[in-house]
Amino acid sequence: MAPLTKKTNGKRSAKEVSHSEKKLAKKPRISIDSSDEESELSKKEDAVSSSSDDDDLDDLSTSDSEAEEEADELDISDDSEEHENENEEKEGKDKSEGGENGNHTEQRKLLKERKMQRKSGTQVQQIKSVWERLRVKTPPLPKQIREKLSNEIWELSKDCISDLVLKHDASRIVQTLVKYSSKDRREQIVDALKGKFYVLATSAYGKYLLVKLLHYGSRSSRQTIINELHGSLRKLMRHREGAYVVEDLFVLYATHEQRQQMIKEFWGSEYAVFRETHKDLTIEKVCESSIEKRNIIARNLIGTITASVEKGSTGFQILHAAMREYVKIANEKEISEMIELLHEQFAELVHTPEGSDVACTLVARANAKERKLILKALKNHAEKLIKNEYGNIVFITILNCVDDTVLVFKTFSPTVKEHLQEFIIDKFGRRPWLYILLGLDGKYFSPIVKNELLRYIELSKATSKKDPLQRRHELLSKFAPMFLSTISKDYSSILTENLGCQFIAEVLINDELYAQLNEKDQEKYQQVLNNILTTFKGDITEEEHPIHRAFSTRLLKALIQGGKWNNKEKKVIPLKNVQGLGVPFAEKLYDEIIDSSNLLEWINNADSSFTIVALYETLKDQKEGKPFLKDLRGVQSKITTDESNKGSQLLAKLLK
């Protein structure tokens, strides 16, 4: 679910979006349980506020005229009491406490009589008395009692349900009924409310009922609601209450086909009215067929986008979907205007798939000046951007497309330096750095992601001048020392993570990176190797020894081999530039960590035996390996070859 922010000076804060965006499951903007209980009344408007904090109280006290009248009646008592006190002081009379109580009682009686005289007033009071028993959560009601009370409420309300749904307490009654009713009864409620869904969507109280109907309703009832709202979505997107209903409908409840139906409405009224005729059309096909249609669609889309952004709805996923339609057909001038409109709230785009696509397209098609504005807007959100499932794609696109690598490094390096340890062990946070190290390697970038990034690179060719490889090498030369410093400082914790070991291997077994290092950084590189060796010291019979972690063993084996494994040729390709891996590392590992006293123990341990196999394959034809081979022959007869130790079996076979 897109993150929720409050409106500030007509626009929602990008910072608030950044702080609230982390999520694994989409959450509704309008809480399903927000208005079931009185205790939640005080926070239900906070949960969906689309304007200022003052609007929260306004919504509860003034949005519904009858609720306002009730509140006014109750408030009369204080004003009346004060007025009477003043008069009595002038006349020298004392007002008794009993008189005050009598005044309150009289006013409440009058208020109750007025309520009873309203339409369905008697039924509402009867229904509320039953509802008070049904809505109890502690202790939970037995199922039979709950069904009995639900049936009783339905019998009392089925003929006047349309009179209940827009009233404060009465609306909550119907919400509870929807929550605890059977599928058939929910369908009946939906049928009873046909023709009122737009009114519900724009009501401060009715919107909660509408969201409950979407949440608990069947596929057919959702389609009924969508069909009725169709033609009004653009209007709802500009409405304070309605925008949140449309967003939840699009994100949480609509099918892919229904989403397409909803988005086409933003093209214009023609596509809202004749939706079946244009069912299979894409925006590109429509715009190719007629320049006039293209201009109308573009005008309608940017009108909705502009109004929603100014209202503070930039973070809405449905708006991102409309933006994606627009950027598909926008010319260079329109792209520039779009960037001007959005650059201050750019961080609000990156947390949804549609918004990420829009952000990447704008970055790719922007000129140097516009890219600078975008980078400035994202600077304070770098950590969230890089770790986000979709935000990291935007960041990689920036690395791919922005020629000013000095600006990129200057903008993001403070955050990267502080959080790099977290990034390299994060599923998404590590991808930008793997791109800098390896390019769009299929090992880390799926075909879908890779093709998307290649599409953005193609779009950027109109405004980006540098060769992509040159740009990547410039970034590598700037970030490589940071990689080494972080690994050298935090190697002990990084090596306990699978993704961390994988990243260290890609940093160390990398000719491109080593070629970018100066003499000082090369010394730091060797220090990292020494630190890794130190990690493997100790008794391998202890459970906490890193040799018992499969990913740590893979890293050690890769450093011993000193090259990149080629899956096609099924062999290790030696490195050309890197110093200290392969034979030197293997020799040092044996001399300083294993030695003759522990060799047999390493061979007969199932977790470490393949490390000895790697040592043998690397050192067998090298003069540096003579001490190792001599010691190996000395313990050959004591090697155990049981079924649980495949490594020792392989080693025994190689030694024959």
From Swiss-Prot:
PUM-HD domain location: 133-483
Entry protein name: Pumilio homology domain family member 6
Source organism superkingdom: Eukaryota
Coiled coil regions, renumbered to chain: none
Residue ranges of Pumilio repeats: 155-191, 192-227, 228-264, 340-376, 377-413, 415-450
GO cellular component, one term: protein folding chaperone complex
GO MF annotation terms: large ribosomal subunit rRNA binding; mRNA 3'-UTR binding; mRNA 5'-UTR binding; mRNA binding; mRNA regulatory element binding translation repressor activity
Biased composition (Acidic residues): 52-89
Keyword set, alphabetical order: Nucleus, Phosphoprotein, Repeat, Repressor, RNA-binding, Translation regulation, Transport
Residues covered by region (Disordered): 1-107
PTM text: phosphorylation by CK2 relieves translational repression activity.
Function: RNA-binding protein involved in post-transcriptional regulation. Component of the ASH1 mRNP which transports the ASH1 mRNA to the distal tip of the bud, where the ASH1 protein is translated and targeted to the daughter cell nucleus. Binds to the ASH1 3'-UTR containing the PUF consensus UUGU segment and represses its translation. This silencing of ASH1 mRNA is critical for asymmetric seggregation of ASH1 to the daughter cell nucleus.
Protein localization: Bud tip; Nucleus, Nucleolus
PROSITE patterns noted in UniProt: PUM, PUM_HD
Gene: PUF6
Origin organism lineage: Eukaryota, Fungi, Dikarya, Ascomycota, Saccharomycotina
Cited PANTHER family: PUMILIO HOMOLOG 3
Extra remark beyond the main annotation: Present with 21500 molecules/cell in log phase SD medium.
